Amino acid sequence: MKAGKVWGETHSVFKNGVFEFHHIKFNKGSKCSKHKHKYKWNGFYVTKGKLIIRVWKNDYNLMDETLLTEGEWTTVKPGEYHQFEAVSDGEALELYWAEFDHDDIERETVGEASGS
């Protein structure tokens, strides 16, 4: 599905309950809204052009700014306000994923080795 945005357009490539993959096109000088996600991580991989990613930390007292060029990647943690600004026309892959617990296992039995 392709959706128009004030900053360009986004095309949803794949999504399920814990992961989304989008191809975005951005227009020079445009920016997305300053926003945050409650549970989702957000990743940006630039394939063409230049994109600034701003992330506000410590309740707005500190703002990190990262300039991404072709082949560069950055991530934004859940709960962090962020925004991107297009330095040039370009394209990027935008990924969203939910954090999961790597120790998410509840054992009812214990595995056994084969007898020797």
Predicted regions and their residues:
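Short acidic-glycine-tyrosine-enriched beta hairpin
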Residues: 57-79
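A short, N-terminal "cap"/entry segment at the start of jelly-roll beta-barrel domains
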Residues: 1-23, 31-34, 64-69, 108-116
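Glycine- and acidic-residue-biased ligand/ion/polar-headgroup-sensing regions
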Residues: 39-58
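Catalytic phosphate/metal-binding cores of nucleic-acid and nucleotide-processing enzymes, i.e., regions
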Residues: 19, 79-83, 87-88
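Short, well-structured hydrophobic secondary-structure segments
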Residues: 24-44
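Double-stranded beta-helix
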Residues: 3-4, 85-116
